[in-house]
A protein has these predicted regions:
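His/Met- and acidic-residue-enriched segments that coordinate or traffic transition-metal cofactors
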Residues: 2-9, 13-15, 22-176
Length: 176
């Protein structure tokens, strides 16, 4: 594994998170953007649910991971997911969005991680992140193809999709 490649990819994740957090995305319906319809709400809920699992599993990995690259990825991922969740919540009028609870599949993955230790934990975390990122990418691509008139939501999905592709590459490098 090329450690510099992994570290450069992780540094890029931080820049994207900062850009999202400072993007000044205006609430739905303002700034000339279309209101949040059913497609936008579904995209947001799905993104927040899978992102929440990525964040929680990464917070666990910060504590439990043995491999330094896994631990560093987890730190960047947790921070990025927090930033993305803030941006998504800011897009809803009144910001009354609650964090969705994980479904059974994601809850089972979290339980497996909580019980794993050492290299088995590292491998399970990276595999779980890879699967989660593939799921997040599918959510973003489906939304982008939907032709939403909400410019902010579409732009966030496009930016997220780009970063998710990079994360998948970094995760594959970590797996070796």
């Amino acid at each position: 594994m090329d450690r510099r490649h992994v570290l450069l990819g992780l540094a890029g994740m931080t820049l994207t998170s900062a850009a999202l957090a400072q993007s000044g995305v205006s609430p739905a319906g303002s700034g000339g953007s279309a209101a949040m319809g059913q497609a936008e709400q579904q995209w947001m809920q799905q993104t927040m649910m899978v992102g929440s699992v990525a964040m929680k599993s990464s917070e666990l990995a910060i504590q439990k991971a043995d491999d330094d690259n896994v631990k560093q990825f987890a730190k960047f991922e947790a921070d990025e997911q927090k930033g993305l969740a803030e941006v998504l919540r800011s897009m809803v009028e009144g910001a009354a969005t609650t964090q969705p609870q994980p479904d059974q599949k994601h809850a089972a993955m979290m339980e497996k991680l909580e019980q794993a230790k050492g290299k088995a934990f590292d491998r399970a975390y990276v595999q779980g992140q890879t699967e989660g990122h593939q799921e997040l990418l599918q959510i973003q691509e489906t939304f982008i193809k939907s032709g939403s008139k909400n410019r902010e939501a579409t732009n966030v999905a496009k930016l997220a999709a780009s970063r998710i592709r990079e994360h998948i590459e970094v995760l594959q490098d970590i797996l070796g």
